[in-house]
Amino acid sequence: AFSEECPYTVNDYSQENGPNIFALRKRFPLGMNDEDEEGKEALAIKDKLPGGLDEYQNQLYGICNETCTTCGPAAIDYVPADAPNGYAYGGSAHDGSHGNLRGHDNKGSEGYGYEAPYNPGFNGAPGSNGMQNYVPPHGAGYSAPYGVPHGAAHGSRYSSFSSVNKYGKHGDEKHHSSKKHEGNDGEGEKKKKSKKHKDHDGEKKKSKKHKDNEDAESVKSKKHKSHDCEKKKSKKHKDNEDAESVKSKKSVKEKGEKHNGKKPCSKKTNEEKKKKK
């Protein structure tokens, strides 16, 4: 099924030979996390599938660039189980049928092109390449470089929003964030602490500087002079306070005399007594 004129290989992730036929692999990871792939050689899609080579061969579907007439192999494609031809990949933006995913069964679908005849693909007779001729699909919903339809409802596999958030690693990180935060809080505490210590050091430096200034000041006779002034002032202030306290004592005494002498309230009590009688 692999001809010289169409040199795709199973793990060709480049776009040098036309559209990136494995563009969907990143969007719908097939059993291996992106983190696990870092630094490793890219796995062939057939090695990623739970069913191994048989499932891989059963799901192949020809996608060609413009120079090819027969091609192999294509990305594993997911298509709605019930695929009316009103929508580019089958299904309509309104009936939600594009959410039902299955491996393509090689029978062709008008959703992939106006004339998609039945062809057994890899299940063809031995000796024939059995690949289906590619018929360009109608343009509705397609965008470059690889035609993943736009306009599907949010939350479907075809939605540009949900591909990463709902099924990809970003979503997983979000859901396991409680664990993540615990670690972060610890680090935050450390940072806060170290900042605090830094501030303390700053304070120490400041106080040392302040002390030096004071030493320098004390040399000046002006400062001694002003200290004497302060002392005089404070003495005067004390005298004032003593005077104040004498005054206040006096006023308290006067108030007391008023009450202890003829009470202004005694008149009232006498009247009340009369009433009771």
From Swiss-Prot:
Q: Where is the composition biased (Basic residues)?
A: 221-237
Query: Where does it sit, as one GO cellular component term?
Result: extracellular region
Region Disordered, residue ranges = 95-114, 162-277
Q: Which UniProt keywords apply?
A: Malaria, Repeat, Secreted
Q: Tell me where on the tree of life, at the top rank, the source sits.
A: Eukaryota
Which residues, if any, are the signal sequence? none
Statement: the UniProt record of this protein carries the keyword Transport: no
Q: Where in the cell is it found?
A: Secreted
Q: Where is the composition biased (Basic and acidic residues)?
A: 169-190, 211-220, 238-259, 268-277
Question: According to its UniProt entry, what is the function of this protein?
Answer: KAHRP might mimick human histidine-rich glycoproteins to anchor host thrombospondin or a parasite analog in a binding complex with the endothelial cell receptor.
Q: What's the protein called, per UniProt?
A: Knob-associated histidine-rich protein
